[in-house]
Regions:
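Short hydrophobic beta-strand immediately N-terminal to the Walker A/P-loop
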Residues: 35-37, 49
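Catalytic Walker B motif of ABC-type/P-loop ATPase nucleotide-binding domains
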Residues: 154-158, 163
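Helix-to-loop junction immediately C-terminal to a conserved catalytic motif
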Residues: 53
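A short, proline-enriched helix->beta-strand linker immediately N-terminal to the Walker B motif
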Residues: 148-152
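ABC-family P-loop ATPase nucleotide-binding domains
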Residues: 79, 83-141
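Conserved ABC transporter NBD signature motif
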Residues: 61-72, 76-77
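Walker A (P-loop) phosphate-binding loop of ABC-type ATPase nucleotide-binding domains
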Residues: 39-44
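Conserved beta-strand
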Residues: 10-13, 20-30, 37, 61
Length: 182
């Protein structure tokens, strides 16, 4: 069996809200693997994912990607990871192309051809406004953005929400095309 390198380490992650506590979450992830969280609504899956990428600040614990701490190397790490949190539900009045023109500026490795391929594959029109898209099409748009900058790790929250089976299969095929860890 191939000895794959560890690319994500979460140790004793804790986050408290008034009515919820995430306690001592720890795990590691090796390159080229797929990992999933299963749990009831409100169990802390989204809080864990958002804490991992520093969108929610954890109370205690550590998160390292590629051996670097997310809190001290956030910009560098975010060039190498990508995340999509369910459907795109912001900037409802904006056209996809407008959102993309801002989004892609954050990534040194943005691949316009890959992005256009995903738009075609997912049948997305860059001239449409977000509010004109179904839930499933919004998810596809979020995935098109997430998959278009050659990330090494793809972090998905509710990745199949509103997607048909063909689109679900496409996500898994994308993993093999880009050698992603999901």
């Amino acid at each position: 069996m191939e000895n794959k390198r560890e690319i994500l380490s979460v140790k004793r992650l804790n986050k408290s809200y008034d009515a919820f506590k995430l306690r001592d979450v720890s795990f590691t992830l090796k390159a080229g693997t797929i990992m999933g969280f299963i749990g009831r609504n409100g169990a802390g899956k989204t809080t864990t994912l958002k804490s991992m990428v520093n969108l929610v600040h954890s109370d205690t614990g550590s998160v390292q990607f590629f051996g670097m701490d997310i809190k001290t190397h956030e910009s560098e790490i975010k060039q190498r990871i990508s995340f999509a949190f369910g459907e795109v539900d912001y900037y409802l009045q904006k056209k996809l192309g407008t959102i993309t023109s801002v989004y892609k500026r954050f990534y040194d490795q943005w691949d316009e051809k890959a992005y256009e391929d995903y738009l075609n594959r997912f049948e997305l029109n860059p001239n449409k406004k977000v509010k004109e898209l179904s839930q499933g099409m919004r998810v596809k748009y979020g995935l098109a953005l997430a998959l278009s900058h050659h990330a090494e790790i793809l972090i998905l929250d509710e990745p199949t929400s509103g997607l048909d089976q063909v689109s679900r299969d496409e996500i898994l095929r994308s993993k093999s095309y880009h050698k992603l860890t999901i």
